[in-house]
Every structure is written in structure tokens, then in C-alpha cells.
Amino acid sequence: MALNFKDKVVIVTGAGGGIGKVYALEFAKRGAKVVVNDLGGSHTGQGSSSKAADKVVEEIKAAGGTAVANYDSVEDGEKIVQTAMDSFGGVDILINNAGILRDVSFGKMTDGDWDLVYRVHAKGAYKLSRAAWNHMREKNFGRIIMTSSAAGLYGNFGQANYGSMKMALVGLSNTLAQEGKSKNIHCNTIAPIAASRLTESVMPPEILEQMKPDYIVPLVLYLCHQDTTETGGVFEVGAGWVSKVRLQRSAGVYMKDLTPEKIKDNWAQIESFDNPSYPTSASESVSGILAAVNSKPADGESVLVRPPKVAVPKALAATPSGSVVVDGYNASKIFTTIQGNIGAKGAELVKKINGIYLINIKKGTNTQAWALDLKNGSGSIVVGAGSTKPNVTITVSDEDFVDIMTGKLNAQSAFTKGKLKISGNMGLATKLGALMQGSKL
């Protein structure tokens, strides 16, 4: 079935030519209302003209589509978004595509070379995304694409300015993916290889022929569709090839009384990727390191640092809603209190928290799970792993959980000491205390 964008409002920056033009044409072809933004400057950021954007709008309209031109700089992101609001009443999809090049070796780079590239790439994407953000939150829908490049992911000679800004967009995208997830706002990054006004000056003709912008567009349309759940991803794409990129971390080495000499002696092991891990969030990264250190390894021992995962036994499959008491677990008192609060103000809590928790309580060698759904309906809590994928997984001992929830143990301190392990949405973990407000045990 064809992916349809009927009545979706799409902003494409740098849409007067190259990849941006093909984005605009294809979105319009599939029913979207398109804001074609292009300042009309050169690939080095000089000059301006309305011709490029106007021609694309004319082409869209000639094919029966709907589009409007905008000639503002991406630094004036509010004006571009306002064009979408005035013309079509909203904004659903934002393609941060505009870019320039000011390539020069670092020793010859001027402040002007750096600042102009920053203003168009990093600041421009920020200004557009920020201007569109609250409109997307209100609609409970949004799709944002950041455009990085191989120069950002890996570095490239003569592109310290360009590469820095392109990597900055990866960080921005990753954070927006986390902040927007609860409001159905998805943000992904692409690193395209395609012929455009930017690349025609640095690639030979025979290579450019294989790098048509048409090969980039299908991935972007897929990522922007309302049925696509992918968010926080980084993808390299070009010439009919698509690949996902992720961070990889070596197993690492634990050393007591760390010294430069010990670093030197263990360097081969430090940089070995024989047993890598793949953290996907700051919380996973930190909790994995703390878990490794708190395991008290021997000096010089390799420590495999992975995000903590707790296997839930099959016997702990979710029970029907009802009693949340499990014999022998003091945490049952906490969950009973939470269950009462959900019954009294479930809809309010769902609106405030909007997340699903899997809480693994450890007691001796046993682990008992409770699933807390504060995302759907009026909320619910069951004994067991639940049937819905959690947004955050919390693992803690029975005693420490009770102390944290009753205010006797500081959660941040427990996390730092490795007593409290969190994977997934760290922000949701900080909201858990709200379930006990006003309650007494």
C-alpha cells in the first residue's frame, strides 16, 4: 500500500533544488501541503533569490499539488513556520535540509567561515524545530528530520566547521526524539550521499550520476509517515543503499588508583572491541558503567559494560487486574497504595505521566515484576511483566524500593551507588514519586 500524506503540512528547507526539491515534489505528489523554503543563495551562502522556490511551487501546482513558497533564512525559523500556519493552519512534518559549504583547512579557517556554517546548519535547524515544536505537541503528532553527513559522523579534511555542525544535529535529534516521544513527535537523522548544489563542486560527474537525490527521498518519506514508529535513529543513505548507524563501546578495563602508566599498560584492552556494548541513552550508559564498577572487579580486569537487563521468568507473566500483593515482598504495600491512587485519579495521572513502567523487585535470588501502565485509559497496575512494552525498566531491591518511595533513601544517591538500575526513559523514572504524593503507609 502506498504511503499517503494527504493533508499533512510539510516544511522543507533548502527546497529550491537538489534533495530538497525532490522532497517537496514527492510529498506534494502524495497529498501533502508543502512549504517550499529556499533563500536562493549560492552553495557558500552568498546572495538570495526567490526564483528557486517559485519554480518548485509552480511545478507542484502544475501537477495538481498544493504548495507555497517562502524565502526566509532558516535563522528566521519562526517566519517559515508562520507561513505554514497562515497558509495551511499547522505544521506536521519538518525537513531540516538547508545547508551551505565553506570548506577550508582548519589552519586557514576564519570566524566568518565557522559562524556562517553554524548559523545555517545548527542554529537554523534549532530555530525551525523550536518554532514548530509546540504546534506539534498540541496536535500530538510531529515528524522531524535532521540532515547530517559523513563529515559529521567521521570527520573530513577541510570541513571542521561543516562536520561539527552536522554532528551537533545528531545530538539535537537524539534529544528531541526522547523529549517528543510521549507526544508522538519522532525525530531521526539522515546522512545522505547525493548530488546537489553542495556536492557538485566536490564530486566527479560519473559519481554524481549514481548519487541522484531520488535515492534519498524514500527513506525520509518512510520515517515521516504517521504509521512509522522509528525515532532517534541515524541512517546513512545513497545510491539505493540504506543503513542504520549506532554507537559501539568497548568492554573497558577497571583500574584501582588510576594512573597514566596503568592506562598505557592496559591500552590494548581498553580499545579492544571483542566484547562491545551498544548503549542507546545517557541513562543506559551511566547505569551500565556503575553496574560494572559496583561489581568490584579485580584491578586490571576487563569489565563488560552493558545496559542492565533483567530477565523476567515465565512464571511472572501478568496476572489479571486485581490484587497487587505478592507474599514476602514489602513492595506490595507501595503497589497497593499506587493502585488506590490510580483508582482515585487515574485519568489525571495518565495525563501527567504518560508512560509504562516495568518494575523488577529483587529479594534474595528472586525477582518479582510489576507492570504499571500510566499511558492508556485510566491507568492500571498488575503483578507480572504486563503485555505492553515498557518505556522504562526499573530494577531495585525490595528494601531499597520501599525506602525510595517513602523518602528514606534518595533516588539519585541510590542510582549513583548502583542500588537503583534504570534503562529506557530516565525522565519517566523521576515521575514515579508523584504516585505517592499525599499518601501514607
UniProtKB/Swiss-Prot annotation:
Family of this protein: Belongs to the short-chain dehydrogenases/reductases (SDR) family.
GO CC list: peroxisome
Organism in which the protein naturally occurs: Dictyostelium discoideum (Social amoeba)
Alphabetized InterPro entries for the sequence: NAD(P)-bd_dom_sf (IPR036291), Peroxisomal_Beta-Oxidation (IPR051687), SCP2_sterol-bd_dom (IPR003033), SCP2_sterol-bd_dom_sf (IPR036527), SDR_fam (IPR002347)
Name of the coding gene: mfeA
SCP2 domain span: 331-440
Group of enzyme by EC: oxidoreductase
MF annotations from Gene Ontology: 3-hydroxyacyl-CoA dehydrogenase activity; enoyl-CoA hydratase activity
Classification of source organism: Eukaryota, Amoebozoa, Evosea, Eumycetozoa, Dictyostelia
Protein name from the UniProt record: Peroxisomal multifunctional enzyme A
Keyword tRNA-binding: no
Residues that coordinate or bind substrate: 149, 412
CDD domains found in the cross-reference section: hydroxyacyl-CoA-like_DH_SDR_c-like
Binding annotation for NAD(+): 11-35, 38, 73-74, 97, 162-166, 194-197
EC nos: 1.1.1.35
Active site per database record: 162
